[in-house]
Amino acid sequence: DQAEVKRVAESLEGQLTATLQMDDGDLDAARAHIQRGRALDPEDRYLRHLYADFLLAESRPDAAIDVLEDYVDQDGALLRLAIAAIDAGDRRADRWAQQFRDRMAAAQRSAEYAHLRELARFTLVVEDDPAEALALARANWRTQKEPADMHIYLAAARAAGEPGAADEVRTFIAEHGVQDSRLAPFLDNGTEAGS
C-alpha cells in the first residue's frame, strides 16, 4: 500500500539524514531527525540503536537504558545496554554483559556471522581488553568500512597503545575524503591525537 511505502521511505530518509548529521557533529539536527523517524516507526531497530548511541554520546546512559531495556532479545540493544549500564553504574551491567558474551560465543560455535564491530566495541568498552578489541576491529575492517568501523578500529589501536596499527584506516580516510566528526579526536595530520 502506498501509505506504507511512503512511511518506510520517510523512515529510511530520516535514518540516513540523522546518521550524516551525527557524523558532521550536528547533534541538534540529528536528534530532530531521529525523533521524527521514531515517530514514523517506533519499532525501527536501526533508529532505536542510533538513538541509544546518540544518548550515550550525550552522556545520558540512563536514557539509553530506558530506550533499550525492552529489547534485550536483540544483540545490538544488549551491547548498548551493557555499555550504558556501566556508564550509569547500573547493577544490571554484569548481567547484560554476560548475556552478550554468551550470545557471541553461541554465534561463533554455530558458525553464524558474528558482528565483529559490535564484538570489538564490547571487548574494548565492557571487557576492557584493547589488544583483543584491536584484533577484532582489524578482522572486521577486512569486510566493513563504515565510519563506525573506522571509529572502533582507531579507538582500539589507541587504547592498545599501538596507534600505528590503524594506519590503514587513516590511509583509507585520506584517500576517500571521509568526513566524520567522531573520527577527529583520533586524527592529527595522520597520527593519533596526543601520541
Residue map of PLM features:
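Alpha-helical repeat scaffolds
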Residues: 1-2, 26-38, 60-71, 91-105, ...
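Generic helix N-cap/helix-start motif at coil->alpha-helix transitions
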Residues: 5-15, 40-49, 71-81, 110-118, ...
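TPR/Sel1-like alpha-solenoid repeat signature
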Residues: 14-21, 33, 48-55
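Residue at a conserved register position within TPR or TPR-like alpha-solenoid repeats
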Residues: 21, 55, 85, 123-124, ...
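Long, well-ordered mid-to-C-terminal structural blocks that present hydrophobic/aromatic surfaces
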Residues: 57, 61, 68-69, 75-89
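Terminal, low-structured helical/coil segments at or just beyond the last alpha-helical repeat
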Residues: 113-118, 122, 126-127, 165-195
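C-terminal hydrophobic structural anchor segments
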Residues: 123-124, 130-154
